[in-house]
UniProtKB/Swiss-Prot annotation:
Native source species: Mus musculus
Classification lineage: Eukaryota, Metazoa, Chordata, Craniata, Vertebrata
Official protein name in the record: Vitamin K epoxide reductase complex subunit 1-like protein 1
Location of this chain's protein in the cell: Endoplasmic reticulum membrane
Bilayer topology: Multi-pass membrane protein
Family classification: Belongs to the VKOR family.
SMART domains: VKc
Protein residues bound to phylloquinone: 142, 146
Ranges in the topological domain labelled Lumenal: 37-87, 136-138
Length: 176
C-alpha cells in the first residue's frame, strides 16, 4: 500500500506576518550589531547609539569575548578560526533561515524551524546569563534578540501544532 499523499496545507496569515516582522527585526538588529562590533574593533573609543549610559552599553557586550563564537568557539577552533565569527553573523544566518524555511509548509521545514528555535532560546539563555552575571551590563540589542528568539519559538510551536492538526484531518478516513 502506498503512503498517503497529503494535500497542500497553508499556514495562517497571522503566522506569516508575525514571522516576517520578527525575522526582519532580527536581520536588522544583527546587521547593526555587526556594525557596532566592527566599529569597536576599528576604534576602541567608538560610542554606539545603543550605548545609553554606564549600565546600558551594547558595544561592551558585543565586543567582549562572548560576542564572538558565543565565547566557546574561539577556545575550540582558535581565536582566528573560521567558525569563531561574531554572534551577529550566526544571528543573521538564523533569521534568514527562519524566514526562508517559514515560506514552506513541509514537515521537515517545521521540524528544522522548531529545532533551530529551541537551540536559539537555549543560546539566548546562556548569553543572558553571561550578560547579567559575568559582564554585569545591559545590552538593549542583545536582550531584544533574546525576545525575538523566544517569539520565533512560540511562532514555530504554533506552526507545528497547526500543521499537525491539518495533516491529521487529511489522514482521517472520510465518512460517507
Amino acid at each position: 500500500m502506498a503512503a498517503p499523499v497529503l494535500l497542500r496545507v497553508s499556514v495562517p496569515r497571522w503566522e506569516r506576518v508575525a514571522r516576517y516582522a520578527v525575522c526582519a527585526a532580527g536581520i536588522l538588529l544583527s546587521i547593526y550589531a555587526y556594525h557596532v562590533e566592527r566599529e569597536k574593533e576599528r576604534d576602541p573609543e567608538h560610542r554606539a547609539l545603543c550605548d545609553l549610559g554606564p549600565w546600558v552599553k551594547c558595544s561592551a557586550a558585543l565586543a567582549s569575548r562572548w560576542g564572538r563564537g558565543f565565547g566557546l568557539l574561539g577556545s575550540i577552533f582558535g581565536k582566528d578560526g573560521v567558525l569563531n565569527q561574531p554572534n551577529s553573523v550566526f544571528g543573521l544566518i538564523f533569521y534568514i533561515l527562519q524566514l526562508l524555511l517559514g515560506m514552506t509548509a513541509s514537515a521537515v521545514a517545521a521540524l528544522v524551524l522548531m529545532t533551530s528555535s529551541i537551540v536559539s532560546v537555549v543560546g539566548s539563555l546562556y548569553l543572558a546569563y553571561i550578560l547579567y552575571f559575568v559582564l554585569k551590563e545591559f545590552c538593549i540589542i542583545c536582550v531584544t534578540t533574546y525576545v525575538l528568539n523566544f517569539l520565533l519559538l512560540i511562532i514555530n510551536y504554533k506552526r507545528l501544532v497547526y500543521l499537525n492538526e491539518a495533516w491529521k484531518r487529511q489522514l482521517q478516513p472520510k465518512e460517507d
